[in-house]
């Protein structure tokens, strides 16, 4: 349907798709996160005391993160997937994960007693990874009526709560601790232009993977 919306202020909360806007394109890289989900095993999870959707993550750069679901599955994810050239989010960033075998291997390495549990599904999706791993907020150019929040870097569940408070204060024109938070208009390093960013991303990712396998 065609139509129009009129508003006094607009918030751009576009995740990885903010790369379509030229001024944001070098603020972050678009890279995939990949997840697998096991078959339901509520009784086996109860045996090891893993209940109530407890979420866990490690401190790797190519992070492993996982939690249980309400029907007793394990949803297990891994960072460091597909890189997008020029931030273009294409078909490689949706649907079943092309890294399902790799992610499953990480799950079974951490929980060898569950190695016999089948994988029911997998999926992939893009994230917007900034140089620092921290999100950024502000106004678009000299337009105080167009605000943005981006760069959650795959850690959006917690920081997006803070981001919502920041964007609400900016949208309402408040002068409070949220509108003046350090993440607002924070200096941020740009990634190199393409193709250096794309090629360099592959090199860095491979080096980090080797380092973390050796640890």
Model-derived segments and spans:
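Active-site substrate-recognition segment that forms the wall
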Residues: 3-43, 47-144
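C-terminal lid/capping helical subdomain adjacent to the catalytic/cofactor pocket in oxidative enzymes
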Residues: 142-148, 152-215
């Amino acid at each position: 349907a065609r139509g129009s919306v009129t508003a006094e202020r607009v918030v751009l909360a576009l995740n990885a798709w903010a790369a379509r806007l030229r001024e944001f394109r070098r603020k972050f890289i678009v890279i995939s996160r990949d997840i697998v989900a096991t078959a339901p095993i509520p009784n086996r999870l109860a045996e090891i005391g893993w209940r109530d959707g407890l979420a866990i993550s490690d401190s790797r750069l190519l992070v492993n993160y996982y939690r249980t679901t309400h029907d007793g599955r394990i949803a297990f994810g891994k960072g460091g997937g597909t890189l997008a050239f020029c931030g273009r989010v294409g078909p490689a960033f949706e649907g079943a994960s092309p890294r399902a075998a790799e992610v499953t291997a990480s799950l079974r390495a951490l929980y060898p007693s569950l190695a016999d549990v089948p994988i029911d599904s997998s999926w992939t999706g893009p994230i917007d990874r900034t140089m620092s791993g921290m999100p950024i907020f502000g106004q678009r150019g000299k337009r105080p009526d167009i605000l943005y929040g981006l760069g959650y870097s795959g850690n959006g569940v917690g920081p997006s709560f803070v981001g919502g408070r920041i964007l609400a204060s900016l949208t309402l024109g408040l002068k409070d601790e949220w509108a003046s938070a350090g993440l607002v208009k924070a200096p941020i390093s740009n990634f190199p232009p393409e193709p250096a960013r794309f090629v360099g991303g592959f090199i860095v990712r491979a080096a980090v993977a080797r380092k973390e396998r050796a640890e």
